[in-house]
A protein has these predicted regions:
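Conserved catalytic core of the tyrosine transesterase superfamily
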Residues: 1-315
């Protein structure tokens, strides 16, 4: 197989296997997203422009072709504006890498940088009212191991405003609950790490959880804090498991609380924590990185207008 532009594919290989992994230290999810973007771009060249993979090279990364690729994602693959923008960001990142390796390719950055991003509609901020949150927390059966586990997970998620993936990734060694200043160590998007303080109530709850679910004689720092047991084998709890039990508890909670949303999902706990702090008077300038996405949605500019809040809690 003869390639028209061998340097193009070598650059893709090094970009995906070395630059994103070693230099940028991106998470596996981000690496996967960038790889998918380039795969889709090559698919577009083949299906829409009739170019075999061997015929594609740097000279084909033009303003016209990239604009056509984004239009194809919209009309043929029905991608949302935010997804289309993510694909464009990945291609721009590749163009930047290519220009670092060979400055003569800086023109790629200029061409692709001129491609307009898609306008995205503002997302509705979904959160649970205080009453709905209380009703949700009442649903797990604390006399059962899984029920107690689910309760502890939801309480910890609300207390720390952690993302679901961040909590399922937590290992016992990431907890520090015996000292004067108890904390939890979270690894977020892009492998960004942060230390989050824990409230006294959560520390007491976690100590009970550890005694019940991780007895001291067999406890190891490398063990995942939250796990499932199937046929006697422990496995890291998945985000799908969290989504399922929260959906179940949300449906049960709606029977006793009319303010419960029709659909309850993990990220609502993160938004709920941020909204409850915001309503209690926390200035946006004090929001740390844990709430950066929420703070962007509640920018000083947007507060001048009604904020889209999806909750039935009375004003």
């Amino acid at each position: 197989m003869r390639l028209k532009d061998e340097a193009f594919y070598k650059a893709i290989r090094d970009f995906l296997n070395f630059y994103l992994v070693k230099q940028k230290n991106y998470s596996p999810n981000t690496q996967r997203s960038y790889r998918e973007a380039l795969n889709l771009l090559l698919l577009y060249f083949k299906t829409e422009l009739g170019m075999e993979y061997t015929q594609v090279g740097f000279e084909d990364l033009t303003y016209s072709n990239i604009s056509g690729f984004l239009a194809w994602l919209d009309t043929e693959r029905h991608c949302s504006p935010s997804t289309i923008n993510l694909r464009l960001m990945a291609i721009r990142s590749f163009a930047k890498y290519a220009s670092i390796v060979d400055p003569s390719r800086i023109y790629l950055q200029v061409d692709i940088g001129n491609v307009d991003v898609r306008k995205c509609q503002g997302k509705v901020v979904e959160f649970l009212s205080v009453s709905a949150l209380a009703a949700l927390m009442e649903q797990p059966d604390l006399n059962k191991k899984n029920g107690f586990r689910d309760f502890c997970f939801m309480k910890l998620m609300y207390d720390t405003a952690a993302r679901c993936q961040e909590l399922v990734d937590v290992r016992i060694g990431d907890l520090s609950i015996r000292g004067v200043h108890p904390t939890i160590y979270l690894t977020g998007k892009g492998r960004k790490m942060r230390i989050v303080p824990l409230s006294a109530d959560i520390v007491d709850l976690l100590k009970r959880y550890m005694d019940a679910m991780h007895p001291a004689p067999s406890r190891k720092d490398s063990d995942f804090l939250f796990y499932t047991t199937i046929h006697g084998v422990r496995s890291k709890m998945s985000t799908d498991t969290v989504s399922l039990f929260m959906k179940k508890y949300g449906a049960a909670g709606k029977q006793i609380c009319v303010e419960m949303p029709e659909r309850v999902h993990p990220h609502q706990l993160r938004h709920s924590r941020a909204m409850h702090l915001y309503r209690s008077g926390m200035p946006l300038t004090l929001y740390d990185n844990s709430f950066n996405q929420f703070a962007e949605q509640l920018s000083v500019k947007s507060i001048k207008k009604p904020v889209p809040l999806k909750s039935k809690e009375p004003a």
